[in-house]
Amino acid sequence: MAAIVLTTINARYIHASLGLRRVYANLGELRAQARIEEFCLTDRVADMAEQILALQPAIVGIGVYIWNAAEVRSLVGLLKRVAPGVTIVLGGPEVSHLPLRVDFGEADYLVRGEGEIVFGELCRGLLAGRPPAERVLAAEPPAVDALAQPYPFYTDQDLAHRLVYVEAARGCPFQCEFCLSALDHRVRPFALK
């Protein structure tokens, strides 16, 4: 059982989500009540929902990317039909920029921007019975050096059999037309440790 389930649908099994681990790392005392569950595009949405709901979460946070937006929409719809009392929070690049390419109207909350800190604050409020008035929460970019690092939360299995991403900076110095990172205008490097 986990009060908070962090999940996403990776493009392939070999991918290990940096975003989920970054959010998990910054949950602080809520980490003891949280769990990461990753899926890939080849998994059936019904199987994903069953695995998530078996953990009896109060809150499900889902990372949304260009490759999984349609599947996430289906997953959210199924979760809401089967367990309408579960709070669904979406974050990630596909919900951070307007206009939304996919309708996520069934989700309870959308976290736009860099949501590591805001997601934890939202969970604290929800678990204490204090939901926010707004459905869309705008996350201000945190100071990168104030963020807890996600790397301790990769498992030995991840390290041996999956791709482990390293984030050296936030933002991108390039302005590629096809990429959402082009909308971020500032590069903020992490300190080398």
Which residue ranges define each predicted feature?
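Radical SAM [4Fe-4S] cluster-binding motif and immediate context
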Residues: 148-193
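Solvent-exposed loop and edge beta-strand segments that line ligand/cofactor-binding
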Residues: 6, 10-12
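Extreme N-terminal starter segment of soluble prokaryotic enzymes
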Residues: 1-5
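Glycine-rich beta-alpha loop elements in corrinoid/cobalamin-binding modules
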Residues: 8, 19, 23-26, 30-146
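Short N-terminal binding/cap micro-motifs at the start of the first secondary-structure element
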Residues: 13-19
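Tryptophan-centric aromatic hotspots in well-structured domains and transmembrane helices
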Residues: 13, 67, 97, 120, ...
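Short, solvent-exposed loop/helix junctions and linker helices
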Residues: 17, 66, 113, 169, ...
